[in-house]
């Protein structure tokens, strides 16, 4: 109803895949029924770009970091004395760019207070370079699918496709899990990647897979939890 209300005023409805996605589950197979016009995902890492790109929605947009705030999420200075937002942007873009070569994103942007960049002209110059690189990468996707080797990889955990690419948080929130490092590596590799559940295994999905990765902590949903007790 809310989306219909937005459309009735001639506007487009986007969902922010960070603060306001709970309950709409972009990977539950029915997300498209809502009728959103686009999805926005803030990103630090490549796997988050793939998380956004794989959703059934017309427009996929990334909100790049660092945000235009005086301090970052961890409290370190960003757009203030002692901060180096250009270095931050380079670090995050290097990670995100790998994934953009594998899956198409339609738009990129920044969030925060625009006036804060006035004292950081090098940041503005670098973001101009980022925008040019993004347009070039997007133009490659307009020409066709990227090259993939024949290897088909499946990441196996309890959630399966419902939690494709993610461990329910940013990299700095989930870095202690081996699986998030694996997801990040896969996000930029030229292989077909899918996320499967143990129910999928029961229904024969492994016949379409060359490599299975199960890398969650023992006993957790990311390894399969009690699914391993089913013999």
Residue ranges and their predicted role:
Residues 1-230:
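Glycan-processing catalytic domains of CAZymes
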């Amino acid at each position: 109803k809310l989306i219909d209300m937005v459309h009735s005023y001639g506007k487009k409805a986007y969902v922010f895949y960070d603060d306001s996605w709970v309950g709409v589950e972009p990977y539950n197979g029915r997300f498209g029924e809502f009728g959103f016009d686009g999805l926005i995902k803030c990103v630090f890492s490549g796997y988050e770009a793939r998380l956004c790109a794989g959703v059934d929605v017309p427009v996929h947009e990334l909100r790049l970091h660092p945000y235009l705030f005086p301090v970052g999420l961890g409290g370190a200075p960003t757009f203030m004395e002692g901060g180096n937002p250009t270095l931050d942007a380079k670090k995050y873009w290097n990670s995100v760019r790998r994934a953009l070569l594998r899956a198409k994103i339609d738009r990129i942007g920044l969030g925060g207070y625009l006036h804060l960049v006035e004292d950081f002209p090098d940041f503005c110059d670098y973001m101009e370079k980022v925008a040019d690189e993004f347009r070039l990468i997007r133009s490659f996707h307009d020409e066709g699918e990227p090259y993939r080797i024949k290897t088909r990889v499946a990441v196996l955990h309890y959630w399966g496709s419902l939690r494709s690419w993610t461990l329910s948080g940013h990299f700095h929130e989930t870095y202690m899990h081996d699986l998030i490092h694996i997801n990040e590596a896969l996000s930029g590799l030229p292989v077909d990647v899918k996320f499967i559940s143990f129910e999928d295994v029961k229904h024969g999905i492994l016949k379409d897979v060359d490599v299975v990765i199960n890398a969650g902590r023992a006993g957790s949903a990311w390894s399969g939890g009690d699914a391993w007790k089913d013999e």
